[in-house]
From Swiss-Prot:
<keyword id="KW-0227">DNA damage</keyword>
<dbReference type="InterPro" id="IPR013765">
    <property type="entry name" value="DNA_recomb/repair_RecA"/>
</dbReference>
<dbReference type="InterPro" id="IPR049261">
    <property type="entry name" value="RecA-like_C"/>
</dbReference>
<dbReference type="Pfam" id="PF00154">
    <property type="entry name" value="RecA"/>
</dbReference>
<comment type="similarity">
    <text>Belongs to the RecA family.</text>
</comment>
<dbReference type="InterPro" id="IPR020584">
    <property type="entry name" value="DNA_recomb/repair_RecA_CS"/>
</dbReference>
<dbReference type="GO" id="GO:0006281">
    <property type="term" value="P:DNA repair"/>
</dbReference>
<dbReference type="InterPro" id="IPR020587">
    <property type="entry name" value="RecA_monomer-monomer_interface"/>
</dbReference>
<dbReference type="GO" id="GO:0003684">
    <property type="term" value="F:damaged DNA binding"/>
</dbReference>
<dbReference type="GO" id="GO:0003697">
    <property type="term" value="F:single-stranded DNA binding"/>
</dbReference>
<dbReference type="GO" id="GO:0005829">
    <property type="term" value="C:cytosol"/>
</dbReference>
<dbReference type="InterPro" id="IPR049428">
    <property type="entry name" value="RecA-like_N"/>
</dbReference>
<keyword id="KW-0547">Nucleotide-binding</keyword>
<keyword id="KW-0233">DNA recombination</keyword>
<dbReference type="Pfam" id="PF21096">
    <property type="entry name" value="RecA_C"/>
</dbReference>
<dbReference type="GO" id="GO:0009432">
    <property type="term" value="P:SOS response"/>
</dbReference>
<dbReference type="InterPro" id="IPR020588">
    <property type="entry name" value="RecA_ATP-bd"/>
</dbReference>
Length: 353
C-alpha cells in the first residue's frame, strides 16, 4: 500500500536524520539491498550435513554452536569447516582454549595449517578478546573457539582450588556475546563455539544433559548442532573410524530438527566419498543393486568400501556426483526428527529457545 505524500516525506526526513546521526546505512529499505537477502554459507565438509542445515552450510555472520559427548567429532567437524573456508580463499582462526590442537590431524582433515591462525589463551577473557579483535578486523572468515567449557575466568585461575565462584563463566559468556553479536553480523564471519555436555542433578523427566557456559549461547546461536558417535567402524579387529550423527536442534535460517549421518575416519576426518555414496543412494542419483553401486550404467564398485575407493581415485567423478546432489538436494525429502523424539539437550524452536 502506497504511503500518503505527508507520511512519505516524514519517513524520508526521519531516515535522513538517522543516517546523519549514526552513519549511512544505519537504516534502509530491504528492497534497496536485495543482495543482503541471500544467505551466504560456508560448507561443512559433509554434504549430508549441508543438506540438513537447509542452506548448504553454516551461515556467515552468525554464531554457531557444536556440542556433544567426548570424542564425538566436534573438533573434526570444525576443522572441516575451516578447510572449506580456506578452499574458498578465506582466513580462519582457531582459539585453542583446551590447549589440545593437533596440527597433524588438522592437516589430514584438509586444513592448510601453514595459513591457519592459532591462539592458545591463558584464560577466558583473553580468548574472547582475541575472538572480538579477529572479528572486528573484517579479515577473518571463520573463528573456532575450542571449547566453551575451557574458557576459565581469570578470577577462577587466580583463586584457590577450592573457591566457589558460581555463575562466573555464564556472566563472562553473556557479556562477550552481547559485544560480539553485532560485530559478527557486520563482518560476515562465522564464529563457531564448541561445547561440552554436563548432567543436571535430580532431573526426573526429559534429558538431564545440558551445555556449559550458561544460557546466553543458546539464545545467540543461529545454529546449534548436537553431534554423537553412533557406531564404531572396524576393519577386522582394528578400529578405523566411527559413524556419526548430527542433529540440527536449532536453526534460524531453515527448518530445525533435521539430521545427517556420515563416517569419520581416523586417517582423513569426514569421509567425503562415503558421504557422497550415502546421499547419492538416498536421492536415487546413485543406484544400488545388490552389493554393486552404479552411476547410470557405469559401475562404481562392489561393496561400499570398494565404491568409496573408486571415488577417492577419481576425484573429478566425485565432484560431478556432488554437483548433481547439490542440484537436487533442496527438492528431496529430508528426514526430520521430532523434538519429542530428540534425545539431545532440551532446546529450540525455529526462532526461540
Amino acid at each position: 500500500m502506497a504511503l500518503s505524500p505527508e507520511k512519505e516525506k516524514a519517513l524520508a526526513a526521519a531516515m535522513s536524520q538517522i543516517d546523519r546521526k549514526y552513519g549511512k546505512g544505519s537504516i534502509m529499505r530491504m528492497g534497496e539491498v536485495s543482495s543482503k537477502l541471500a544467505i551466504e554459507v560456508i560448507p561443512t565438509g559433509s554434504i549430508a550435513l549441508d543438506i540438513a542445515l537447509g542452506v548448504g552450510g553454516v551461515p556467515r555472520g552468525r554464531v554457531v554452536e557444536i556440542y556433544g559427548p567426548e570424542s564425538s567429532g566436534k573438533t573434526t567437524l570444525a576443522q572441516h569447516i575451516i578447510a572449506e573456508a580456506q578452499k574458498m580463499g578465506g582466513i580462519a582462526a582457531f582459539i585453542d582454549a583446551e590447549h589440545a590442537f593437533d596440527p597433524v590431524y588438522a592437516a589430514r582433515c584438509g586444513v592448510d595449517v601453514n595459513n591457519l591462525l592459532v591462539s592458545q589463551p591463558d584464560y577466558g577473557e583473553q580468548a574472547l578478546e582475541i575472538c572480538e579483535a579477529l572479528v572486528r578486523s573484517n579479515a577473518v572468515d571463520v573463528v573456532v573457539v575450542d571449547s566453551v567449557a575451557a574458557l576459565v575466568p581469570r578470577a577462577e585461575i587466580e583463586g584457590d582450588m577450592g573457591d566457589s565462584l558460581p555463575g562466573l563463566q555464564a556472566r563472562l559468556m553473556s557479556q562477550a556475546l552481547r559485544k560480539l553479536s553485532g560485530a559478527i553480523s557486520k563482518s560476515r564471519a562465522v564464529v563457531i563455539f564448541l561445547n561440552q555436555l554436563r548432567l543436571k542433578i535430580g532431573v526426573m523427566f526429559g534429558s538431564p544433559e545440558t551445555t556449559t557456559g550458561g544460557q546466553a549461547l543458546k539464545f545467540y546461536a543461529s545454529v546449534r548442532m548436537d553431534i554423537r558417535r553412533i557406531e564404531t567402524l572396524k576393519n577386522g579387529q582394528e578400529t578405523i573410524g566411527s559413524r556419526t550423527r548430527v542433529k540440527v536442534v536449532k536453526n534460524k535460517v531453515a527448518p530445525p530438527f533435521r539430521q545427517a549421518e556420515f563416517d569419520i575416519m581416523h586417517n582423513e576426518g569426514i569421509s567425503r566419498a562415503g558421504n557422497i555414496l550415502d546421499v547419492g543412494v538416498e536421492l536415487d542419483i546413485i543406484r544400488k543393486s545388490g552389493a554393486w553401486f552404479y552411476l547410470g550404467d557405469d559401475r562404481l564398485g562392489q561393496g561400499r568400501e570398494n565404491a568409496k575407493q573408486f571415488l577417492n581415485e577419481n576425484p573429478a567423478l566425485a565432484d560431478e556426483i556432488e554437483r548433481l546432489i547439490r542440484a537436487h538436494a533442496m527438492a528431496a525429502p529430508i528426514s526430520i526428527v521430532s523434538p519429542k523424539e530428540d534425545d539431545a539437550v532440551e532446546d529450540a524452536g525455529l526462532f526461540e529457545e
